[in-house]
Amino acid sequence: GVILDSPDMQKRVKQLDYGVGFNGYFNAGVMLINNDEWRKNNVTQESLSMINCGKIFRYADQDVLNILLNGKVKYLQRKFNNKTTLSVNFDAEAKNIDNTIIMHYVTPNKPWYKIFKARYFDRYFNESPWKNNRRFFSPSPSEIRLKAKREMSGKNYSIGLYYYFCYLISKVFRLRF
């Protein structure tokens, strides 16, 4: 089972001419896989062969899976893959979360880094068996610097200085905290 990708992505992929029907391209970040069928059709090996054939696929493994599984998938409701993004420059999570089963953070910015505000993730993380596990502060020093700039431009000087200090420490001492 897969979830159709956004209309914008359908248009972009149509131009790539992969042979995937318009409005048939799915987001491969969340898939419900029938393991017996997957093995029977040798999907892992076929995917690796395509990825290593030398052709450049715009959306990498997602394109390959769409090509290989074209016409062989069942489409599920969007609530099983509600895509959202995170950034230090704005606070955003999925707007329509009613009935959401799986929230999928689609950028490299993931909610398990403390620098990103992700109220839904935080809520469920704090109720999970992993609530006492350490969460890293940021994926990179540059994200900390962006957060510092955002806070400073919002006139939150003490918070901005705190993040800038964290940025300097992580950059100079190559620390990850």
Feature roles, as predicted:
Residues 15-21, 89-91:
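Short, P/G- and charge-enriched loop/turn segments at secondary-structure junctions
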